[in-house]
Amino acid sequence: MKKNTLFLGLVFIGILTFLVNLLAKTPFALNANLSALTIAILLGILFGNTFYPKISQYTAQGVIFAKGTLLRLGIILYGFRLTLQDISNVGINAIATDTIMLISTFLLTLWLGIRYLKMDKQIVYLTAGGCSICGAAAIMSMQPVTKAESHHVSIAVAVIVIFGTISMFLYPLMYPYLATWLNEHQFGIYIGSSVHEVAQVYAAGGNISPAVADTAVISKMIRVMMLAPFLLLVSWLLTKQNDQAKTTNISIPWFAFLFILMAVINSFSLIPAHIVAWIVEIDSLLLIAAMTALGLTTHISAIKQAGIKPLILGALVLCWLVIGGFFVNVGISQLF
């Protein structure tokens, strides 16, 4: 891998981000209600499975940096769009819903993958973590815990991105039909508690309204903050199963806590409004860049090599997230 792949990769991502912004302002995109993030993932997947592999050796480090570091920075700065009042308004509803969905999704995925589909346990554990918490970030965090092979990580990430991308389109389409049972606030919690990736949550909510997007992201960040204790629990369970006492490094999602810190700073107006407006603009570009990079690294070939079972698992879990998640959210909204 060449030393300048970080710089060239970031330049490449910057060009694609500029292109996405142009496409998002076209009449077609505006009439179809396609957000910049939705266009970014589609464009990324298209390029990632056509010409990008031919230039990946020159841009790989930059694309990986955008997919990881820029995504986390984008989520941290997203806190400047919110205040403590916004976070408190989500309330116990989001905490209860997120907890139920996390536990049920993880256990259901394990049962379907290991007991029903007879899949490789590493792939199933990684997929379960990605579906139940925060997508690729959770998968990457679980890799040292599960000792998973790199190609297993690629398969799990591909499944998450594919079905998370489907969710991005599905939830906005469902909203008009489910508005009778869930208002904007509740639908935001529904998205945040059941869509795979943080960026996908933002895209799905943003395709409905800014209010839904804000609530969805806050709800999602509650799930993200559950990652650290979740990893500790999974590590303990796997160690117990394997009868080992090896110490495993746990990846703590500090960006989730920094997200809250930015919201605190914004709540007390510690930064001038015109600077906050600039930060929000920069944040939008960071999220577009991260989503584009995520699409570029989604390789359809990895899914083909793994066979049909990962796709079946991803589809079954998506059905639970959409249908089961709806009933869980309706039930919780009736209780609180």
From Swiss-Prot:
Membrane topology: Multi-pass membrane protein
Keywords: Cell membrane, Membrane, Transmembrane, Transmembrane helix
A Pfam family this chain is assigned to: Cons_hypoth698
Coiled coil spans: none
Entries under InterPro entries matching the protein: UPF0324_pro (IPR018383), UPF0324_YeiH-like (IPR004630)
Entry's transmembrane regions: 5-23, 30-52, 62-84, 91-113, 123-140, 153-175, 221-238, 250-271, 275-297, 310-332
Subcellular location: Cell membrane
GO CC annotation terms, alphabetical: plasma membrane
Statement: the UniProt record of this protein carries the keyword Endoplasmic reticulum: no
The keyword Transmembrane helix is annotated on this UniProt entry: yes
Family, per entry: Belongs to the UPF0324 family.
Protein name: UPF0324 membrane protein PM1461
Organism: Pasteurella multocida (strain Pm70)
